[in-house]
Amino acid sequence: MGNADERRFEVLRAIVADFVATKEPIGSRALVERHNLGVSSATIRNDMAVLEAEGYITQPHTSSGRVPTEKGYREFVDRLEDVKPLSAAERRAIQSFLESGVDLDDVLRRAVRLLAQLTCQVAVVQYPTLSTSTVRHLEVIALSPARLLMVVITESGRVDQRIAELGDVIDDYQLSQLREMLSQAMGGKKLSAASAAVADLVGRFRGTGGLANAVGRSANVLLESLVEHTEERLLLGGTANLTRNSADFGGSLRSILEALEEQVVVLRLLAAQQEAGKVTVRIGHETAAEQIMGTSMVSTAYGTSGTVYGGMGVLGPTRMDYPGTIASVAAVALYIGEVLGAR
């Protein structure tokens, strides 16, 4: 790329930085005063004219200054050479705050609240997806001789409890047999494989009384737990940040709020995150969702040891501090994975 192109990109970079900071359209005089671009105001005006002609900036009707377009933001993001990481103190604070979570739900609630505070945007965290979860432990507890509590714990820390009404009583020996069979069928398996193994048990133990009845009834309860789509759950934090930035969304704020409430659009974007440590930035129309066209979404996956549990990120206006937001999303995702992996 030639010197003129490099210089024009520096002008674009300065326009993005100033517009994000001030919310005001940027003129050539302001660029000369605030940035050491090493060229005259006339040269900057010429560069801005080229950037506008190429679609990187535009002129609002009510101002003589310029603002970045979606294309301009994309060029800015694509050419971010280094994203400054959070400070050591900030990283320690994040880690400590998440480690204080008492269970999966608490850790994720803390994460979404923290991410919203760090970025001043709406934070979204997807609950761990069933398709990638593994059964860590199954507990079968007798509440009475004919009533069992089934507790399934996944490696991500998700806990699901169900009651199995047996109809007939079983003794302690049969309870021990049942617990061992179910644990062997499910333990260490992905939930899809665990579901198949439990279904196989139902086929092998057909009967109306004793152990066969207990296996059938408890297995059916477990199948209900395993096949429920709890991945279609989304935690939100910082929704009030949208209203504080309402001017950035024009008349689309209501549709954005509706999309967040319905969750489907955001979950689809998060489900596309399949690689922990890789941050994706979607700007405006790149979301491919009409309800949130006026937003940008910065997202990544979180998980442990090569296993992706779900997606997370932030949603906000295209006028966003992209470097800071990328760093915050990456850091919180990293520490969620570390905290969940240590449990």
From Swiss-Prot:
GO terms for biological process: negative regulation of DNA-templated transcription. GO terms for molecular function: DNA binding. The keyword Nucleus does not apply. The keyword Repressor applies. Keywords: Repressor, Stress response, Transcription, Transcription regulation. It comes from the Bacteria. Belongs to the HrcA family. Negative regulator of class I heat shock genes (grpE-dnaK-dnaJ and groELS operons). Prevents heat-shock induction of these operons. This is Heat-inducible transcription repressor HrcA. It comes from Mycobacterium leprae (strain TN). The gene is hrcA.
